[in-house]
Amino acid sequence: MSVSVLSPSRRLGGVSGILQVTSLLILLLLLIKAAQLYLHRQWLLKALQQFPCPPSHWLFGHIQEFQHDQELQRIQERVKTFPSACPYWIWGGKVRVQLYDPDYMKVILGRSDPKSHGSYKFLAPRIGYGLLLLNGQTWFQHRRMLTPAFHNDILKPYVGLMADSVRVMLDKWEELLGQDSPLEVFQHVSLMTLDTIMKSAFSHQGSIQVDRNSQSYIQAISDLNSLVFCCMRNAFHENDTIYSLTSAGRWTHRACQLAHQHTDQVIQLRKAQLQKEGELEKIKRKRHLDFLDILLLAKMENGSILSDKDLRAEVDTFMFEGHDTTASGISWILYALATHPKHQERCREEIHGLLGDGASITWNHLDQMPYTTMCIKEALRLYPPVPGIGRELSTPVTFPDGRSLPKGIMVLLSIYGLHHNPKVWPNLEVFDPSRFAPGSAQHSHAFLPFSGGSRNCIGKQFAMNQLKVARALTLLRFELLPDPTRIPIPMARLVLKSKNGIHLRLRRLPNPCEDKDQL
């Protein structure tokens, strides 16, 4: 038997040939990909030729325009320059079309287009596929099943829970008054709204605002909200594998594990309680049914119940949507009143007329605050908690002015742009609650702090109740004053925040009329 031995030069030649072929294949694939991106960009340019926009870089698009937390200023500039809608390019072949006209909003929100996958996929590890991220028939089934959880009869007992949480926050503020320095309110309000959600969703005992045992869970929730937004703004993090290898990816994984573990433990404990014979009747006698009770007892139309994974997703979605969004709304409302003392005093007089005898705030009081409600709505116009929402067109669409967009285009409904559109809101920077006076004429889609259409915020009433309770109890105890040295700079995150915080000075009111629960 003969054995042939390749010489070193022949072996090297074989390896070199393989490397050359591999390099050529990689180059060919890159050329094909580049050609695909070029052709796709050309298709987009043709599809969007009816929608002018500022000049963009061929690779980076308009990304640089939206750096340094200037997105909201850029949106306002576009609203004034480009009627109704304006594309903005990101990374060459990707584009979003911003809409900020009420007629355009009405068209899109009247359709059943799915949420934009590119904009919302980063939330999936955080909250799972609950009502916010679901689409199609599954979304419809979950929406129908969850609607009873937000019925007025269910929401009524929550008013007392909201008041309890607000009172704890105000007590903390009173302790801090001795420091004679402005108070950054958003962090306090965010913790208070999380406290309210914990009580409403889980019947949590005590207050996480003062419970040190809850700090790790609170930190995980806060970290996830920040990490998700940073991930959305980094093109390299769009790839799950790459993101998982980064420090932020590992941090996100740990925070998700902690948050999900907490939710899972609560769900399993409650399931075990409800499975005991007669336990449900005992619960009803002791307390109101909370969000988790209703989820566990609910059934689909086919008689099936939610899986543990679906339960966690819906609970985490409720926690996410009802926490930072409401905190943003309350914080900006307090700032708006601090900078408009006449409106603040008129709201206080209205609330004093309802609760001035020391009455506890109840469900029935919430509909007896017309001027306070007008001020809340005007603050939500100026500072919408959710700056924008995304949709991916499932079919072509034609707008009332004749312009059209093809299937597959991502549209961003800029609620901030809509609320700051001078063609919709004259003197738009003026805080004018009379815009929302009874009988005032408005386009049906000119004011969308809770979105609109079939996919509007299911917890709208819950949120409005909390805004009213927080506003009422705060004004009864404190006079709100702005800090002229630190004027808030609004910036778009998952919710509307301030780049430098929301700092207010508080002045304790003499002989405050507080609700009976404080006695």
From Swiss-Prot:
Consequence of changing L428P: In allele CYP4A22*6, allele CYP4A22*9, allele CYP4A22*10, allele CYP4A22*12, allele CYP4A22*13 and allele CYP4A22*15
Annotated effect of mutating L509F: In allele CYP4A22*7, allele CYP4A22*10, allele CYP4A22*11, allele CYP4A22*13, allele CYP4A22*14 and allele CYP4A22*15
EC main group: oxidoreductase
One Pfam family cited in the UniProt record for this chain: p450
Residues of the propeptide: 1-4
One MF annotation (Gene Ontology) recorded for this entry: arachidonate monooxygenase activity
KW Lipid metabolism (keyword) present: yes
Reaction it catalyzes: an omega-methyl-long-chain fatty acid + reduced [NADPH--hemoprotein reductase] + O2 = an omega-hydroxy-long-chain fatty acid + oxidized [NADPH--hemoprotein reductase] + H2O + H(+)
GO cellular component terms given for this protein: endoplasmic reticulum membrane; extracellular space; intracellular membrane-bounded organelle
Modified-residue entries (Phosphoserine), positions: S440
Family, as annotated: Belongs to the cytochrome P450 family.
Protein function: Catalyzes the omega- and (omega-1)-hydroxylation of various fatty acids such as laurate and palmitate. Shows no activity towards arachidonic acid and prostaglandin A1. Lacks functional activity in the kidney and does not contribute to renal 20-hydroxyeicosatetraenoic acid (20-HETE) biosynthesis.
Name of this protein: Cytochrome P450 4A22
Originating organism: Homo sapiens (Human)
